[in-house]
Every structure is written in C-alpha cells, then in structure tokens.
Amino acid sequence: MQSGKNAAASAKETAANVAASAKAGMEKTKASLQEKGEKMTAHDPMQKEMAREKKEERKHEAEYEKQAAKEHNAAQKQTTGIGTGTHSYTTTNVTGHRTGTGGI
C-alpha cells in the first residue's frame, strides 16, 4: 500500500511538472509573438530593443515560475508521505498520552 501511495504521489508530481512546463512554453511563445508584433510596428531602433528586452524578461519570468512550481510540487510530494508512517493510538482520548498512561 505504501508503494502505491508513493507511485500516485510521483505520478501527480510528474503531471503537475508537465503542466508547469507546458504553461511556461506557452508564455515564452506568447512573449516571442508579442515581440515580433511590436518590432513590426516600431520604427525606432530603441523601440525594437525595448521589445526584445521585454520578451527576454517575460521568458525569464516564465522559467522562474516553472522552477518555483516544480519545487512546490516536490515539496507537496514530500508532505504527502509524512502521514503514512506508524500511528500511536490512545485509550484515554487524551492527546499526547499513549495507551492510557497518565493524564487524567
């Protein structure tokens, strides 16, 4: 059962990472297309340079967001496995005391 939970968590992490990569790719493509549009309408070399810099900034931001999402997904996978260890049960219904010793 434990390995099944780990496999499910890994699959979920992989799917989330694929989605993050796809989103970043779309953002980078949109940035490139926007740059081309701005360069076509710009007459001044300075405006063309500003369009290129804006594209680069958007591409870096998309890459940063992708990496942040991957780190978040890895952390989420780790927290999924935390609650799967051994549990202690209480017979006194008092939190913090195992098997009824002390407390009441």
Curated annotation (Swiss-Prot):
The family database entries (Pfam families) matched by this protein are listed as: LEA_1
Q: Which tissues is this protein detected in according to the database?
A: Maximally expressed in dry seeds. Also present in mid-maturation embryos.
Q: Where is the composition biased (Basic and acidic residues)?
A: 25-74
Which residue stretches does the UniProt record annotate as biased composition, category Polar residues? 75-89
Question: Keywords, A to Z?
Answer: Stress response
Show the InterPro entries listed in the entry: LEA_1
Q: Which GO terms describe its biological process?
A: embryo development ending in seed dormancy
User: Ligase as a keyword?
Assistant: no
State the conditions that upregulate or repress this gene.
By abscisic acid (ABA), osmotic stress and heat shock.
* Chain spans, region Disordered: 1-104
Q: Which residues fall in a compositionally biased region of kind Low complexity?
A: 1-24
Q: Which interval of the chain is the signal sequence? A: none
What is the protein's known function? LEA proteins are late embryonic proteins abundant in higher plant seed embryos. They may play an essential role in seed survival and in controlling water exchanges during seed desiccation and imbibition.
- PANTHER family annotated for this entry? LATE EMBRYOGENESIS ABUNDANT PROTEIN 46, LATE EMBRYOGENESIS ABUNDANT PROTEIN 6-RELATED
Its family?
A: Belongs to the LEA type 1 family.
The entry's protein name is 11 kDa late embryogenesis abundant protein
* Native species: Helianthus annuus (Common sunflower)
Q: What is the lineage of its organism?
A: Eukaryota, Viridiplantae, Streptophyta, Embryophyta, Tracheophyta
